[in-house]
Structure formats: C-alpha cells, structure tokens
C-alpha cells in the first residue's frame, strides 16, 4: 500500500493508520494507492470521472479485481475536514470510515440500490466499530 500526500498534511492521519484501516476492510491481497488531495485536484477528478462540478470526499478507482486487487482511493482533505466539522465527527474517525468505504468499493460493493446500500453500510459499521470508532451513520449531537 502506498500513501501519497498531495495536500497539506496538517490534521491528516499518518500512513500507519491508513494501513490499519485498509487491513481491517480488505478480504484479499491488494495493491492500493491512497492519494490525499486538495480541493483543486478533488474538483478536477470528480468532474472528469463523475461529471460533478465540485470535489467529493472519496473517489475509488478499480484497475483489476483479480488477485491481487489493484486500485486507487482518492481522499479530498478539505472536504473531509468540512464534513467532520459539520457532522460533529472526530476527524480521524471520519478518515477511517472513508477508507473503509473506499476499500469496500474496490472489492465490488456499492450503494447504488437501497438494498446494496444497506449491505455496504452494515459492513462499514461492523468494521468501523471493530476498530473502536463510533458508528459513522449515527448523527452526533
């Protein structure tokens, strides 16, 4: 696993935590690149690959679903920080959730249908709580 910091590293968890989170969500051998980007790169990637005119928190790119699984997870640091603040979530816990979310996407899970979303969110919650973080789908007051 490779972690690329293309954004200011302030308040971004370290490589060891990313490795721990990926390991908790992964069910097969993989070669994964995690890239943490700023707002500008986040906007460019989301526009190019999803047709959206703003940055999003996480993008996942699967290159091979064979063994080893090959893919990239792109995290937009400013979006993640803003969401954590708006949702009263611990920033590290939010990063953990988004990494788990991205790794599940790499393994073929999605949330396009309501049924698939229930399955994926249930897995995310199970993994995140096993890592001793709060359920990411419970609104914090």
UniProtKB/Swiss-Prot annotation:
Keyword RNA-binding: no
Binding site for Zn(2+): 101, 105, 111
Cofactor note: Binds 1 zinc ion.
One Pfam family linked to the record: YbeY
Gene Ontology MF term list: metalloendopeptidase activity; RNA endonuclease activity; zinc ion binding
Compartmental location: Cytoplasm
GO-annotated cellular components: cytoplasm
Enzyme Commission numbers on file: 3.1.-.-
Gene3D superfamilies named in the record: Metalloproteases ('zincins'), catalytic domain
Keywords: Cytoplasm, Endonuclease, Hydrolase, Metal-binding, Nuclease, Ribosome biogenesis, rRNA processing, Zinc
Enzyme class (EC, first level): hydrolase
Gene Ontology biological-process entries: rRNA processing
Main location: cytoplasm
Cofactor: Zn(2+)
Entry annotated with the keyword Coiled coil: no
Homology family: Belongs to the endoribonuclease YbeY family.
Entry-linked PANTHER family: ENDORIBONUCLEASE YBEY, CHLOROPLASTIC (PTHR46986:SF1)
Record's function text: Single strand-specific metallo-endoribonuclease involved in late-stage 70S ribosome quality control and in maturation of the 3' terminus of the 16S rRNA.
Protein name (Swiss-Prot/TrEMBL): Endoribonuclease YbeY
